[in-house]
């Protein structure tokens, strides 16, 4: 295996979406033990550079594969033959129209509530809405897991592959919209654990 | 490999440690003291460091620099607000902070270098051998500029800094040797000037940091200031005197406040008596622990937000943390312990001396790098998101915070004008949406792009964060395959050229023979590469063909031939040629290592077999 390997190949895995997290972690630790720069301090400059490069690859691969959502995103990127996540426009087709409309409604309601100073009753409504959307997101993620299992079952030449990829892309898009609104609601509630960065990445 | 020491370069105190057998040990000075106060005094008779410098604080406040760590990698604007607490003056500047001492101005890395040099000398005296290599710790929440400044300080002190390691994770290594074998661990590190929280997963010798957060401007210093402000108001009310304008009195108050704070960790009440003959008064005051706690409670509360954020980033609940470890002198304060215990719902550990544990851990990491420990590995993360400024002044994140390092990200750039040969990038660190709200790390200029029509060049830029958490940038134009040279202009740091010049100047001051020193360095480097090549050949001869082995053998023989000569350029040239000759072998070895990793059996499986 070389530095050009894709993330599945890095860990010696088939291009499947169901991955045993313990086994993935075991391989990650094992590979880190072999290539981490700590162990090449006395190596040739070539070894030091090579270990740095491979260690970065192994870390990126682990980070991407350990989480279902980023794993699916990466798989789509691979299947579509894109070099980077840059073309992520491809991952953002339209979310279902009704979801979009609903999210706009929630956003407007939130703006209105904020403009009125967010009193106790309004806070409670925002909180309930927040909880509802978190649940909704969990449903989407369950759907993604089902699709992932289906993907693992279809063979290489199967015509269903394309359709499955499209369906996964739609779930990712829906999830991204939900995330934006969930974060906005969370911010309005003054949650400390807001992730400024990650919500922008979707 | 020669001995590598571990150094904790602290805000208030610094320490050096080494591996003595299986366990690390801190190195005392001739008087048996292990803590070196991080104070440097520039006196007419010369430079003092440590205990003797600390004694100058009250007499010569303007020439005695303390807490310089707060200025490392910072700009004037960053520290302006706290300057009223410091007796020394800073030159207003847009770039790196410069501290005025007498008729000269020194940068924070230069001051830190003097502290490091004192530790280096202490270690050399104790070990009876030259010490040239070190692992230095920094707060986990230090950004790229602050890390780079620390590395620069090491170089200025004549130390090769093999690794910058995070303080809380260093502490976890020290604990790991003793008792931490498996589980999730929160390391709460509150020192003199900085606060860090790191959440780790420990398993089979791997210390994997899941998330880290903190505040590089929050620590014991701030508690002292709260107390000083309270004393100032009290003196004004009772004696009608404003001591705030008297730098010497301020130093007296600061030191008294620090001492009172420390006593109140053990006693319920304490009494202060400070004579101020120049103001015709003696300040006498009893203070209770509860009063101190009321003053510092808001500051202690400020550490809890980062703790919750780190937990969220690690996707863990407080209840899922198996152990909480306390590090840093400020964790001796009972209120701090109470707040930590409330948050995590369990009694925190502090078996190892909180002042020493970071240096001990640095020595462990040093031993790992030297090859003395092979079954422990620390996998750390980058504390802040790294990105570039894009159109409209927005920060585009390339590497999110809490990504395991080393890591890299690739980004494509092009030109916007015909014939353009230079492309600018502004690299930022932080969590905010707008570029201007984040930390400016550096501006990079990609040069040497072949003139083409606008938008034609395809420049692939690789942002690589190494195991020190320090950024390296490489660029390549894909059409021509030519590497673009990258010029770095650090926003709040020294350029490589400046560090180089300072190093040379320090040689001149030491009246050392620069030429012979450079020759020795070249020979040392040659020896390292010779040894590494011999080892690589031993391990990987079967991976390469006869021609390649012959080429490497030839380059090795050439280097061995010139190694003992006095021609530094010949040694360096032959070293570089040997490096080039071994590049492919190195790649082959690395790939073989990855393959072996995949083929290896799970550890548990192996254990079961040996047991049965």
Where are each of the predicted segments found?
Chain A
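C-terminal accessory/regulatory regions appended to core domains
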Residues: 1-202
């Amino acid at each position: 295996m070389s530095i050009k390997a894709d993330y599945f190949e890095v860990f010696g895995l088939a291009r499947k979406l169901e991955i045993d997290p313990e086994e993935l972690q075991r391989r990650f630790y094992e590979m880190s033990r072999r290539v981490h720069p700590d162990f090449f301090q006395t190596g040739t400059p070539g070894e030091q550079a090579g270990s740095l490069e491979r260690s970065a690859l192994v870390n990126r691969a682990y980070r991407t594969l350990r989480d279902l959502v980023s794993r699916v995103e990466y798989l789509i990127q691979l299947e579509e033959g894109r070099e980077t996540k840059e073309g992520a426009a491809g991952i953002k087709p339209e979310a279902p129209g009704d979801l979009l409309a609903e999210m706009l409604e929630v956003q407007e309601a939130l703006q209105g509530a904020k403009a009125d100073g967010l009193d106790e009753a309004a806070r409670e409504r925002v909180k309930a809405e927040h909880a509802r959307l978190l649940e909704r997101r969990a449903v989407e993620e369950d759907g993604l897991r089902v699709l992932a299992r289906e993907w693992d079952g279809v063979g290489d030449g199967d015509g269903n592959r394309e359709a499955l990829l499209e369906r996964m892309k739609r779930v990712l898009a829906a999830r991204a919209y939900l995330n934006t609104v969930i974060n906005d609601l969370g911010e309005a509630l003054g949650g400390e654990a807001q992730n400024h960065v990650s919500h922008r990445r979707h | 490999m020669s001995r590598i020491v571990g150094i904790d370069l602290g805000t208030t105190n610094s320490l050096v440690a080494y591996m003595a057998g299986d366990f690390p040990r801190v190195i005392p000075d001739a008087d048996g003291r292990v803590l070196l106060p991080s104070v440097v005094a520039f006196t007419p008779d010369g430079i003092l460091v440590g205990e003797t410098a600390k004694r100058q604080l009250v007499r010569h406040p303007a020439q005695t620099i303390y807490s310089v760590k707060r200025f490392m990698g910072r700009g004037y604007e960053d520290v302006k607000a706290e300057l009223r607490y410091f007796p020394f003056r800073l030159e207003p500047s847009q770039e790196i902070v410069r501290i005025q001492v007498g008729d000269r101005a020194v940068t924070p890395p230069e001051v830190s270098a003097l502290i490091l040099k004192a530790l280096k000398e202490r270690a050399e005296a104790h070990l009876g051998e030259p010490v040239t290599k070190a692992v230095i710790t920094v707060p986990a929440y230090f950004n790229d500029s602050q890390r780079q400044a620390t590395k620069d300080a090491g170089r200025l002190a004549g130390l090769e800094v093999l690794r910058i390691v995070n303080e809380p994770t260093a502490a976890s290594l020290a604990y790991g040797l003793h008792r931490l074998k498996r589980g999730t661990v929160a390391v709460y590190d509150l020192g003199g000037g900085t606060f860090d929280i790191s959440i780790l997963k420990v398993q089979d010798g791997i210390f994997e940091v899941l998330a880290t957060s903190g505040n590089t401007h929050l620590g014991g210093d701030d508690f002292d200031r709260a107390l000083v402000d309270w004393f100032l108001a009290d003196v004004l009310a009772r004696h009608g005197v404003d001591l705030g304008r008297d730098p010497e009195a301020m130093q007296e108050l600061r030191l008294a406040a620090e001492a009172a704070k420390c006593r109140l960790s053990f006693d319920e009440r304490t009494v202060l008596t400070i004579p101020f003959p120049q103001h015709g008064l003696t300040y006498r005051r009893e203070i209770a622990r509860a009063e101190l706690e009321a003053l510092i409670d808001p500051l202690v509360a400020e550490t809890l937000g980062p703790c919750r954020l780190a937990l969220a980033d690690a996707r863990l609940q407080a209840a899922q943390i198996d152990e909480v470890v306390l590090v840093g002198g400020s964790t001796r304060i009972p209120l701090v312990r109470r707040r930590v215990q409330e948050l995590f719902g369990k009694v925190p550990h502090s078996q190892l001396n909180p002042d020493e544990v970071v240096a001990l851990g640095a020595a462990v990491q040093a031993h790992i790098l030297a090859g003395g420990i092979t079954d422990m590995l620390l996998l750390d993360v980058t504390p802040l998101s790294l990105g570039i400024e894009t159109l409209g002044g927005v920060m585009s994140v390339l590497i999110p915070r809490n990504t395991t390092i080393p890591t890299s990200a690739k980004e494509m750039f092009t030109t916007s004008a015909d014939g353009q040969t230079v492309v600018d990038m502004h690299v930022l660190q932080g969590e905010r949406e707008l570029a201007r709200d984040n930390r400016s790390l550096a501006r990079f200029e990609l040069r040497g792009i072949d003139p083409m029509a606008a938008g034609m060049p395809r420049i692939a830029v690789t942002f690589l964060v190494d195991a020190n958490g320090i950024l390296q940038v490489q660029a390549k134009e894909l059409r021509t395959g030519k590497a673009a040279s990258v010029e770095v202009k650090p926003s709040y740091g020294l350029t490589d050229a400046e560090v180089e010049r300072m190093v040379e100047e320090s040689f001149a001051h030491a009246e050392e023979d620069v030429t012979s020193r450079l020759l020795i360095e070249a020979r040392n480097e040659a020896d390292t590469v010779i040894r590494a090549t011999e080892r690589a050949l031993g391990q990987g001869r079967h991976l390469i063909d006869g021609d390649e082995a012959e080429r490497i053998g030839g380059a090795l023989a050439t280097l061995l031939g010139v190694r003992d000569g006095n021609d530094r350029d010949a040694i360096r040239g032959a070293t570089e040629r040997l490096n080039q000759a071994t590049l492919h072998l190195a790649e082959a070895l690395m790939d073989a290592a990855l393959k072996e990793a995949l083929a290896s059996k799970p550890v548990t499986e192996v254990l079961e077999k040996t047991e049965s």
